[in-house]
């Protein structure tokens, strides 16, 4: 069980590291996370050490949607559902790899 948990965390770290590898050009640099509101810190060797995990404020929609309809978020991995009035949507907040 401990080995399985270690592997999960190691794979998650590698995936996050790969997603941000171009963003960390300077040690100690802080970069914007893919969600657009959290921040990640770069280690001395230019690898992401960790990111904040705060709740992000809802984003405003630039267009309306069909009430009750579901659609893919622009990140390609989260799913959104349109509100009953078609003026807002709620999306899942999974970390995308």
Swiss-Prot record:
InterPro entries: Pacifastin_dom, Pacifastin_dom_sf. It holds the Pfam family Pacifastin_I. It comes from the Eukaryota. Residues 57-59 are annotated as: Pro-Pro-Arg motif necessary for proteolytic processing. Belongs to the protease inhibitor I19 family. Inhibits trypsin activity and prophenoloxidase (PPO) activation, an enzyme essential for both clotting and insect innate immune responses. It does not inhibit activity of chymotrypsin and protease K, and has no effect on phenoloxidase (PO) activity. This is U-reduvitoxin-Pr10a.
């Amino acid at each position: 069980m401990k080995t399985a948990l270690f592997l999960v965390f190691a794979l998650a770290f590698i995936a996050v590291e790969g997603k941000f590898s171009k963003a960390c050009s300077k040690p100690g640099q802080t970069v914007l996370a893919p969600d657009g509101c959290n921040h990640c810190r770069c280690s001395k060797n230019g690898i992401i050490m960790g990111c904040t995990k705060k709740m992000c404020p809802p984003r405003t929609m630039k267009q309306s949607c069909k009430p009750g309809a579901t659609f893919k978020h622009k990140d390609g991995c989260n799913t959104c559902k349109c509100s009953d009035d078609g003026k807002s949507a709620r999306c899942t907040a999974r970390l995308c790899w």
